[in-house]
C-alpha cells in the first residue's frame, strides 16, 4: 500500500492571472503534466520552484495498486498526455491528476476528484472569458476600421450582445 497525496500550487500567467497546478504523489515520486509533457520526479515539493507556490496538500488515503501495475497504466495514460496535446484549459495538469486518481483509487479519492473538478470548472470559465474578450476586441477593431459611420452603432450593440452571452 502506498500513500496518495494531491498537491495544489498557484502560479501566475503573464504575471497577472492566477492559475493552479496539480500533481499527485505516490510511490515516493511526484507525477505531473505540463506543456513539456508528463513528468515523474523524486522532487516531492515544487514550492518556490519556477514561480510555484504551494497552496495545499491533501491526503487522499492509500492505494492497493502495486507500483508495477501503476507503471503499466501510466504508460498508456501518457499517450493521451503528450506535450503536443497540452492545453492550458482543456488538457492540463489537473486533468492528468484526475486520471491518476481514477487509476490509483485511493481510499479518500473522492476528495481529490471534487477539488480537481472545481479547479477545472474555474479554469474553463476563465478560458471562455479570455476567448470572448479577444473575439470582441477583434470584431470591434475590424469594425471601426472598415465599417461606414452609419453601422458603427450597430457594431457596438453586437459587441454588447456578445459580451452578455459570454
Region locations from a protein language model:
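Non-catalytic ligand/cofactor/substrate-binding and regulatory segments of enzyme domains
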Residues: 1-91, 100-107, 115-129, 156-161
